[in-house]
Amino acid sequence: MKTYLEIKVPINYDDPWFEELRSHFAGIPVRWQKDFYHITLVFINDTPKGMDLCTILKKHLVTAQAPVLTFDQLDVFAVSSGMHIIHLTATDVPDTFLALIESIHDDMKSVGCVILSDFMLHVTLGRLKDFNIQLPVLRSLAKSFSMSPLSMVLTDVDYREFRGKTIYETQLSRKENL
């Protein structure tokens, strides 16, 4: 069974910067994501039959602090199908957040989970299937978009079936000085 662990990112389709971004890409047939913004922490291609991964997740997430991420870059990448993904990312990611993801990833692999992709911090904003528009053109357009950094505390974590129901959800604790 394909599953994934995600942390929700509290952005809104109607945010002014997102409206400006869509205008910036006017004339390009982007399918903009309208909700469910998140960062996939671990994508599990296959889970051993009968394996309950909630124990591993609780081990790591019960004491984890909510990361503060500053999204300060817009970029585009292509997936194996050739589709282009327009996304937000952060250039400075807290080491504690990266260590948490790596520990969860390692523990899941150690119990036999098949994980074929490495972690890549990004929040999908839109998808483009027009193969006539080349990646360098899209990247140049993304880089020319001027945006102010967006700092956010990320607290809501979901473990879900791929395109299915939530298996486990929790909230990471906030640091007391936030």
List the predicted regions and their residue ranges.
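Histidine-dependent nucleotide/RNA phosphoesterase domain, centered on the 2H-phosphoesterase fold
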Residues: 1-178
